[in-house]
UniProtKB/Swiss-Prot annotation:
Cellular localization per UniProt: Virion
Gene: 10
Family in the record: Belongs to the T4likevirus baseplate wedge protein gp10 family.
GO annotations of cellular component type: virus tail, baseplate
Region of interest called Disordered, as start-end residue ranges on this chain: 501-523
Protein name: Baseplate wedge protein gp10
Main location: virion
Biased composition (Polar residues): 501-512
GO BP: viral release from host cell; viral tail assembly
Length: 602
């Protein structure tokens, strides 16, 4: 934080900083600048990137304006983005993968409550090697970044391209499969090799435990994948099959439909390490018969699909209990395949976990993986699944049934050119309104349809439900609007003094703008004489007046006025309600019924 030197009011008045204190502030200011803009000693005009290691913690609380080089070699990292305000629009946070580890241990972006990432509140996983993110905070509380941008390239598409090649071995002892895709490189970060139906192990990085790699310069040498050739560590027999499958550009799109997780098992008696989600699981392997799926580092909001789950122990595909002739239940303590006979023989009829079984929660979401296998220190469990049932062998009609429940039928996009955003949620209306650049809206999601029906600034009313609309519509940010006031249509005729001008949006000269949002009126009014027309009584009357010219009740010509009793009058108009000062005010309120009124602000 910047420190200012207090120079006092006049020379040597004793109110300013003394020389040493001023020097300390200067040094601290420069130290902070040199650290934020460089390595602490030298400023970098190209920008200063601070390294963050997963070993320092799996959660990084990002700060405005900072740049992070994130090393996930030891585990996944979640980036919690800061909560912004209108004043934070256009502020930037950068993150990149210079260690080439995000494809192995991805980074997950999490927006603060009320904010979104590209319009969605769901966390976003970035699992592309050499990813280069520039996160910009935009209106209204929305983080934006360029997809598919990497340090070494920008991929041309976000569409997942899958290439697959199968080989039937015709030469005994064959290990090499050269130029697999005939001049086209495969993705070294996403490639699957199967030998006789069993998926071979490669690992996060190439090692002596890898079952395959690429040919080296020396005879029989196995080296890291080169993007073109494949060499197996173990030779094949005639008639064996080898399948090679790779996922090209659009890895993020592919991962959204196909997900892979793996962990290495470590015996707590043989290591001092602790469990790290998505990387290692430390426990007493001699007694371990289950493992929670959370140990695989699952993304919130992206659960495992049990219909397409595949489990592999050390690269060998396992079968679900109850399938391929394997029992769903078995007899423990006796030799029997029948529940009744098992009980008679003194056994216990229990659910089988051979090869494995899955325990789910009340919503059918997998929670725990059970098995009968005994694992050793360093063994690997690999799980893969499609996030929807389209990845399984559904019929066309079954696919249509599933997609009808999940997706919106997409028609042609429409050009949007008049959309607006609010820039101040506390002062709703002009001048706190900004235009949105023209774009095309595709109707491929319910949220897009909602944006069309209820754009920013839309007023919504409900007669009985007092709750914020987001709690029952599921979309948008809403705020109570126009409490205790009625709505009047804005007049495009600027000469209308009441309903054409906005007295809440004044220019530098104090003149109101020709926009909606003007306010006025009152619930009651007190009438004044100026509000009344001239009035008088229909007939003249006699009014008591000592100086009146009309005498009633006495002699008209009594010189000394000592004769009979009389009263003098004059002719004039009569007054009314002379004591009503001030008069009672008049209520202007028309017959009404109240409703809950909201305006969409974001």
């Amino acid at each position: 934080m910047k420190q200012n030197i207090n120079i006092g009011n006049v020379v040597d008045d004793g109110t300013g900083d003394y020389l040493r204190k001023g020097g300390i502030k200067i040094n601290e200011n420069f130290d902070e600048l040199y650290y934020e803009l460089g390595d602490g000693d030298v400023p970098y005009s190209a920008g200063a990137w601070k390294t963050y290691n997963a070993s320092s913690g799996q959660t990084l609380t990002a700060e405005w304006g900072k740049s992070y080089a994130i090393n996930t070699s030891s585990g996944r990292v979640t980036i919690n983005l800061p909560k912004g305000t209108v004043n934070d629009y256009n502020k930037v946070i950068r993150a990149r993968d210079v260690f080439a580890t995000w494809n192995v241990n991805p980074v997950t972006l999490v927006a603060a409550s009320g904010d979104t990432i590209k319009g969605s509140a769901v966390p976003v996983e970035i699992n592309v090697r050499f990813s280069d993110l520039e996160l910009v905070y935009c209106a209204p509380g929305r983080w934006e970044y360029v997809k598919n941008k990497q340090i070494d390239k920008i991929t041309s598409s976000d569409i997942s391209n899958v290439a697959r090649k199968e080989f039937l071995v015709e030469v005994q002892g064959q290990t090499d499969f050269l130029d697999v895709f005939r001049g086209t490189s495969y993705n070294v970060n996403n490639i699957r090799v199967k030998h006789r139906g069993n998926e071979l192990y490669y690992g996060d990085v190439f090692s002596e435990n890898s079952d395959f790699g690429s040919p080296g310069e020396n005879e029989g040498e196995l080296v890291p994948l080169d993007g073109f050739n494949i060499r197996l560590r173990q030779p094949c027999n005639i008639g064996d099959t080898v399948q090679i499958e790779t996922f090209m550009d659009g890895v993020s799109q592919w991962r959204s439909s196909y997900t892979r997780r793996q962990i290495r098992l470590l015996d707590s008696k043989l290591t001092s390490k602790t469990s790290l989600e998505g990387s290692i699981y430390v426990t007493d392997l001699s007694t371990m018969k289950s493992i929670p799926f959370s140990a695989f580092g699952l993304i919130p909001g992206e659960p495992i699909n049990p219909n397409s789950l595949e489990v592999r122990f050390n690269g060998i595909l396992q079968e679900l209990a109850g399938t391929v002739g394997m029992p769903l239940f078995h007899c423990v303590g006796a030799d029997s395949d029948d529940e009744v006979e098992c009980s008679v023989l003194g056994g216990t009829w229990e659910q089988s976990h051979t090869d494995y079984s899955v325990e789910t929660d009340e919503n059918g979401i997998p929670e725990i993986l059970h098995f009968d296998s005994v694992f050793e220190h360093g063994d690997i469990i690999n799980i893969t699944w499609f996030n929807n049932d389209l990845g399984t062998l559904l019929t066309k009609d079954e696919i249509i049934d599933e997609t009808d429940n999940l997706y919106v039928s997409q028609g042609p996009g429409v050009d949007i050119s008049g959309d607006v955003n609010l820039t101040d949620f506390d002062k709703i209306g002009w001048p706190n309104v900004e235009a949105v650049q023209s774009y095309q809206r595709a109707f491929n999601a319910v949220s897009n349809i909602f944006d069309t029906i209820y754009p920013i600034g839309t007023i919504y009313e409900n007669a009985v439900n007092p709750n914020n609309p987001v709690t029952y519509m599921g979309f948008g940010s809403w705020k109570l609007f126009g409490q205790g006031k009625v709505l009047v249509g804005w007049n495009e005729d600027i000469s209308d003094p009441n309903f054409a001008l906005n007295n809440n949006d004044l220019d530098s000269g104090g003149n109101p703008s020709h926009t909606a949002g003007g306010t006025g009126g009152s619930t009651s009014v007190t009438l004044e004489n100026a509000n009344l027309p001239a009035t008088e009584t229909d007939e003249e009357v006699l009014i008591v007046d000592e100086n009146g010219s009309v005498i009633v009740g006495g002699c008209q010509y009594d010189p000394d006025e000592s004769g009979p009793i009389y009263t003098k009058y004059r002719e004039a108009k009569a007054s009314t309600n002379s004591t009503h000062t001030p008069p009672t005010s008049i209520t202007n309120i028309q017959p009404y019924i109240t409703v809950y009124r909201w305006i969409r602000i974001a």
